[in-house]
Every structure is written in C-alpha cells, then in structure tokens.
Amino acid sequence: MSDPIKLHDLRPAKGANKAKTRVGRGEASKGKTAGRGTKGTKARNKVPAYFEGGQMPLQMRLPKLKGFKNNNKVIFQVVNVSDLEKAFPNGGDVAVADLVAAGLVRAKQPVKVLGNGEISVKLNVTAQKFSGSAKEKIEKAGGSVTEA
C-alpha cells in the first residue's frame, strides 16, 4: 500500500511550468533592444495612455466649464391645483402635512402650488410658495392661500 497523498507533497509535473523570459539580460535573452526594436519613443520609454499621437487631446478639445452651481438653490416639490381637487374633494383646510399624508409630496422638502388644471372646491391651502395663477384659482373657488 502506498502512502496517502498530502497537500504539501503536491508538485507540478516536470516541464509544466516554464520560466518567464527576462528580457534585456544578456544576448541570449533578447539582450540589447529587448524586443522593442531600435530607437524611437517606444524603445526608450512608455507613451502615456492619454497621448493621441499629436492630435489635439480630448481635454483640450472640450469647452471649459462656465458659470457655477448654486449650492443654496431651493428645489420645490410641485403640486397642481387639479391634484388638490382630486385629493381633497370635500374641501377644507390643507397643510403640507395633509399633502404628505395624501401622498402628493414628501416630508421635509418645501412645496410650491402651481395653477395647472381647474379647481371648484373651497380649500384653505398652506404651503411655502404659490404661483400667481394658483393663488387666483384657489381664491376664485372661494378658498384662501397662506404662505408658510
């Protein structure tokens, strides 16, 4: 009976692993030019990945960025008067919390009411901002507008 095979005894077969040719280490191992040919940029060192062969580089072809980004810009969530009529058909007082409960807006973000559509129910709406047409339509329907 032979001994069981052990992991630390395993070796690759003879000739299975061939050593990598180390170029440029004497004439026998591609000495002198080391497989790079003679002279020129590629023989002497590497060309950067971004080099386009003398063509105007991409970063210089593209226009410069102009202007700036206003980090203090307030982005409002939008609700139209037609949405208000659908969500509150019986009329009454409508605050931002009611709009959140109705699923029209998310909490913790300012709300602007816009005048798209028609409204016929009396609503007393409280929000951060209103467009001119939204104010006009809500007040024409007998409601009121309060900016919070």
From Swiss-Prot:
Binds to the 23S rRNA. GO terms for molecular function: rRNA binding; structural constituent of ribosome. Residues 1-12 have a biased composition (Basic and acidic residues). Belongs to the universal ribosomal protein uL15 family. Part of the 50S ribosomal subunit. The gene is rplO. The lineage of its organism: Bacteria, Bacillati, Actinomycetota, Actinomycetes, Mycobacteriales. It holds the Pfam family Ribosomal_L27A. GO terms for cellular component: cytosolic large ribosomal subunit. InterPro entries: Ribosomal_uL15 (IPR030878), Ribosomal_uL15/eL18 (IPR021131), Ribosomal_uL15/eL18_sf (IPR036227), Ribosomal_uL15_bac-type (IPR005749), Ribosomal_uL15_CS (IPR001196). NCBIfam families: rplO_bact. It comes from the Bacteria. The keyword Transmembrane does not apply. GO terms for biological process: translation. Keywords: Ribonucleoprotein, Ribosomal protein, RNA-binding, rRNA-binding. Residues 1-45 are annotated as: Disordered. This is Large ribosomal subunit protein uL15.
